[in-house]
Amino acid sequence: MESTLGSDLARLVRIWRALIDYRLKPLELTQTHWVTLYNISRLPQEQSQIQLAKAIGIEQPSLVRTLDQLEEKKLITRHTCANDRRAKRIKLTEDSASVIRELDGVIESTRNEILGGISREELAFLSTLVQKLEQNIIQLQSR
């Protein structure tokens, strides 16, 4: 019988993300918005869109729509890089700090609820397995 681990993991990510999106809906934000804001807030100031896309692990064109939405919500600003007119620098606005705190609170409480009833040891073991799977995949990709 064929293993369904890949499908199981994909489904888990899909329903986890759907729950986050549902819980962020009152804030008129999504999990994608949160991931983007989270990464912007943790990277050195005024990263380029290219650097941000690499940090998130997506292609730059995929990021542009999310950045457009965040700019419309006045959570970020973008301006042309002085050294390279093709590059755009991203900066969080003052308004974004309180929104990011609120987002982080929703994400953290949701994570705690999802992981309820799972021991620290079980989580550590799961994390080790996921890291091993990731290493195996990276090695296979480099062949």
Swiss-Prot record:
Query: What ranges are recorded for DNA binding?
Result: 49-72
| Top-rank taxon, per record | Bacteria
Q: What are the recorded Gene Ontology BP terms?
A: antibiotic biosynthetic process; response to stress
| Subunit description | Homodimer.
This protein's name: Transcriptional regulator SlyA
Q: Which residues form a coiled coil?
A: none
Tell me what organism the protein belongs to: Photorhabdus laumondii subsp. laumondii (strain DSM 15139 / CIP 105565 / TT01) (Photorhabdus luminescens subsp. laumondii)
Q: Which InterPro entries match?
A: HTH_MarR-typ, MarR/SlyA-like, Tscrpt_reg_SlyA, WH-like_DNA-bd_sf, WH_DNA-bd_sf
Which Pfam families does the UniProt record give? Answer: MarR
PANTHER family assigned to the protein according to its UniProt record, in alphabetical order: TRANSCRIPTIONAL REGULATOR SLYA, TRANSCRIPTIONAL REGULATOR, MARR FAMILY
| Ranges where the HTH marR-type domain occurs | 2-135
> What are the entry keywords?
Activator, Antibiotic biosynthesis, DNA-binding, Repressor, Transcription, Transcription regulation
Q: Which gene encodes it?
A: slyA
Known SUPFAM superfamilies for this protein? Answer: Winged helix' DNA-binding domain (SSF46785)
